[in-house]
Amino acid sequence: MKFANQCVAGNTAPEQMLTNFEMQKEIVKTGNIKDVLQSKNHLLVQILKEPISTKGPRLTCEISLAGRFLVLVPFNDSVGVSKKIDSAEERKRLKVLVESLKPKNFGVIVRTVAAGKNASELHQDLLTLQNKWQEMMRNLKGAVPVTKVLSEMNKTTGILRDLLSPQFNKIVTNDVKLAKEVEDYITQIAPEKKDIVQRYTGTVPIFDNYGITKQI
């Protein structure tokens, strides 16, 4: 809340990240919300889940920015590594590497797909996330409720970011716009794999052609 108010007032320079921000004590989550918040307080929140039927969106004040290999967690200082990476030695390597790269007052979660990646690849992903954070800070200046200060990538690129792995050898779509979108994103994050994107032009429906209809 303090950070959001500073950004709205223009008292925080985006390029400083959180270097000069004085971290606050952790809020006791079993306490009474009235002891922490008052009416008309301005909060920086992130949507965790879109609204469904009569239920509104699920929100959190614990902001996180997901990248290809890393997740940036502001107002934190720890580095966690996915336990799905089997090798203890590799987990240790990644932890030490990311600890040397991360900015002050930011935590980082190392995703499973980061296994085997070098310092340059991880650093580039981290810089991309830092740029997103700085963009959000710039958008906060002068913002009034309710303002969207940062947009997540669309569903297509979000799925690719989370699921694309070295085992992928083909991505097929019958939509020209979608094919271009996927190819552009893969060219950005894994240029060596851009040729796996193919556009289906057959007369048989694409789901029937690949036997997907039977599975659903």
Specify the residue positions occupied by each region the protein language model found.
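DE-rich acidic low-complexity regions and acidic surface loops
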Residues: 1-216
